Swiss-Prot record:
This is Profilin-5. Binds to actin and affects the structure of the cytoskeleton. At high concentrations, profilin prevents the polymerization of actin, whereas it enhances it at low concentrations. It comes from Olea europaea (Common olive). It holds the Pfam family Profilin. It comes from the Eukaryota. It is found in: Cytoplasm, Cytoskeleton. Phosphorylated by MAP kinases. Keywords: Actin-binding, Allergen, Cytoplasm, Cytoskeleton, Disulfide bond, Phosphoprotein. A motif (Involved in PIP2 interaction) lies at residues 81-97. Occurs in many kinds of cells as a complex with monomeric actin in a 1:1 ratio. Belongs to the profilin family. One of its GO terms (molecular function) is actin monomer binding. The variability of the residues taking part of IgE-binding epitopes might be responsible of the difference in cross-reactivity among olive pollen cultivars, and between distantly related pollen species, leading to a variable range of allergy reactions among atopic patients.
Length: 131
């Protein structure tokens, strides 16, 4: 299965009548492996900050997490594995695998829990595949 198919079929799938606003699979260096049409362009320093938070959980909490200049308040995730952010009625979930970052961005009416489920399920699957 292509990386684009993982984004289209697994991340952008319909959940209880809703779907993510945008999604992507990135390399740890920020290289885009596949993305949805509306996925924002990360800046290199944003990826650096995200990767540092995986290595040093809590790094982003004081300043927030920036994605394409949009600021997300960092909320509880899983240290070293999942970063979650909130911005207004939406948010972001980032799951780190051995080689990739699985990213989902949502807006209401999708819930944070639905976003977490979609992103983390694919991330867990990729980890089991050695990715």
């Amino acid at each position: 299965m292509s990386w684009q198919a993982y984004v289209d079929e697994h991340l952008m799938c319909e959940i209880e009548g809703h779907h993510l606003a945008s999604a992507a699979i990135l390399g740890h260096d920020g290289t885009v492996w596949a993305q949805s049409a509306d996925f924002p362009q990360f800046k290199p320093e944003e990826i650096t900050g995200i990767m540092k938070d995986f290595d040093e959980p809590g790094h982003l909490a004081p300043t927030g997490m920036f994605v394409a200049t949009a600021k997300y308040m960092v909320i509880q995730g899983e240290p070293g594995a999942v970063i979650r952010g909130k911005k207004g009625a939406g948010g972001i979930t980032i799951k780190k695998t051995g080689q990739a970052l699985v990213v989902g961005i949502y807006d209401e009416p999708m819930t944070p829990g639905q976003c977490n489920m979609v992103v983390e399920r694919l991330g867990d699957y990729l980890m089991k595949q050695g990715m």
